């Protein structure tokens, strides 16, 4: 079981709602992923109606919505989006995203920390999307964030675990859940993140952009489960040298000396 912001979930795979070709494929993929938490960009909600037809099927599945502030360029804009999400969706949960660079979508660490501290004071359950920076993640934890979401590689890139060395440090030090976010492009990469000890992963593009999103969602679900079980089982230690699994040493030492001579060539 996975505990996040005082809620318990059976799935450790979070999914997104963007980039799918249609809403039917999106919903079927989410169901196949067994995910219980889905992210939702505020820009996808109709401000006049207060809702969008994307919400109805998601809520009907009993999913926990995690609105994000994607598109915010600074702390002020992110806080505005957070208040809007709280009013429209009646939730204090928030994925905090601040990326002023539209090309690479790198999160702004300074604005993110400023916004996170203020939002935590306002009662939000903040899950910040950040660089895989152990120092920043610790600071975010100190200001009250419910979890940290360090990136594996640039968002939407499918490049995989480019920040693995730093993710390991964050996982080792964190006292809040670590959700590896952004850039995971294959089920094997999600499995590896879980093997490292991540509490959960968030996947969107790798599922939505695949040839068969519904099947791919199921693959990610299975990979996350396998990775978590492998972590709990304890991976074998990597050795710098070879090691026999079934050495013959003891058996050969018991053989009579005359039987150990070199065989004569024919």
From Swiss-Prot:
UniProt: 1-deoxy-D-xylulose 5-phosphate binding residues: 156, 182-183, 204-205
EC assignment: 2.8.1.10
Keywords: Cytoplasm, Schiff base, Thiamine biosynthesis, Transferase
Protein localization: Cytoplasm
Active site positions, chain numbering: 95 (schiff-base intermediate with dxp)
GO annotations of cellular component type: cytoplasm
Broad class of the protein's primary localization: cytoplasm
GO aspect biological process, one term: thiamine diphosphate biosynthetic process
Family: Belongs to the ThiG family.
The protein's name in its UniProt record: Thiazole synthase
